[in-house]
Amino acid sequence: MKKKGFIIGGICLAVVAGILGYNHEAVRVVFHNVYSPSVKLDDSSKWNGGKAYEKLPYSEASENDYLDLYVPDSEKPMPLIILVHGGGFVYNDSQSRQAQLMYRYFRDHGYACASVNYRLAQEAAFPAGVEDVKSAIRFLRANAEKYGYDPERFAIWGESAGGYLSVICGASNDEEFNSVPFIGEDENHPVSSEVQMILDYYGCVEFGTMEDDYKELRIPRIVRWAASLWLQGAIKDTGYEDVESYWMRKDVKTLTEDEKN
């Protein structure tokens, strides 16, 4: 029944948006995100078995603070890819369609993967989600030996809202957004939330022009509302207009074309 309700709601949203002349591609993306948490992909034939830990709690701040960890069989510790799902800060979870596609790809190519769930805007606004993800990173580093991956080779990847969270978490230092303790922090303190690579897949990093961009692209008002809900008010009035304010790590740099290749 819940799944049916989401589908009907998504169809209604698409119809209304079409009548009002909104960008049809934007409507498709919104509908896809509304529906995607209900999608369960077929098991991957490339997965070698390894070890899987689903809904592993990393913090006691919320029942939604958990992650799904996948560690392929390997003779030595492997790099860890930390995945942060999108959904406009108001929807999706660690098993969204996008998250499943990404962790399966990396997992099947020999990387350990952790798909992180975090508090959405309707439960707790900015910076709760950022603090949750950084808590998850510290939890993963503290438990690297237990689960079998390399604590010195962490990358964080996020799409859409998850891309925004990934950039802030990766570019800020350990003193920023560290108020959510991870489970076991008392026995492991201090643990760094630093990552060695940040991958942002179409995540917004500058909110200052977002309102104008949304209007120009005829993005549905409900999508514009999501970011405002996340920031607890109109974007231009919050003081959190871009990620640059939190670009604390001096060693962060953009990859050159040669390095990308």
PLM segments and residue spans:
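N-terminal Sec-pathway targeting helices
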Residues: 1-16
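Alpha/beta-hydrolase superfamily serine-hydrolase fold, recognizing
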Residues: 15-261
